[in-house]
Amino acid sequence: MIAGIGVDVVDLARFGRSLARTPALRDRLFTEAERGLPVHSLAARFAAKEALIKALGGSEGVRWHDLEIVSDEERNPAFVLRNVVERQALERGIAHIHVSMSHDAGIATAFVVLERDS
């Protein structure tokens, strides 16, 4: 059963300028494992984090490091949740988080579907 859906888009050029103008932003938004990725990958991950927050219904108490995107052996993205976000997902009975990210034509986008078992 679908429990939530979220989508977000990020302008790559604007996001890149923001990271260049405010170097601390990279540290604030991304975990240590994510920070070394290229700007287009960071923008897609930021869009995915925003989409997950929308799917959960809000960002109260959420810290950006509570949401991390990792890739499996086949480079499929998946979330690692911590702290407040992990508790929110457990309280809502979220069994699966599906995430899709892409970037093209100067835009990064992400789509998240939250699923309960029944």
UniProtKB/Swiss-Prot annotation:
The record, for Pfam families, names: ACPS (PF01648)
One of the GO BP terms on file: fatty acid biosynthetic process
Q: Does the keyword Metal-binding apply?
A: yes
Provide the catalytic activity annotation: apo-[ACP] + CoA = holo-[ACP] + adenosine 3',5'-bisphosphate + H(+)
Family matches, as InterPro entries:
4-PPantetheinyl_Trfase_dom (IPR008278), 4-PPantetheinyl_Trfase_dom_sf (IPR037143), ACPS (IPR002582), Ppantetheine-prot_Trfase_dom (IPR004568)
Give me the residues that bind Mg(2+), please.
Answer: 8, 50
* GO molecular function terms listed in the Swiss-Prot or TrEMBL record: holo-[acyl-carrier-protein] synthase activity; magnesium ion binding
Q: Which UniProt keywords apply?
A: Cytoplasm, Fatty acid biosynthesis, Fatty acid metabolism, Lipid biosynthesis, Lipid metabolism, Magnesium, Metal-binding, Transferase
May I have one GO cellular component term?
Answer: cytoplasm
The question of whether Cell membrane is a record keyword is answered with no
Q: Where is this protein localized, as stated in its record? A: Cytoplasm
Cofactor(s) recorded for this entry are:
Mg(2+)
Which branch of life, at top level? Answer: Bacteria
As recorded in UniProt, its EC number(s) are 2.7.8.7
Q: What does this protein do?
A: Transfers the 4'-phosphopantetheine moiety from coenzyme A to a Ser of acyl-carrier-protein.
Family per record: Belongs to the P-Pant transferase superfamily. AcpS family.
Protein name, entry field = Holo-[acyl-carrier-protein] synthase
Q: Which source organism does the UniProt entry give?
A: Leifsonia xyli subsp. xyli (strain CTCB07)
Lineage of this protein's species?
A: Bacteria, Bacillati, Actinomycetota, Actinomycetes, Micrococcales
Q: Which gene encodes it?
A: acpS
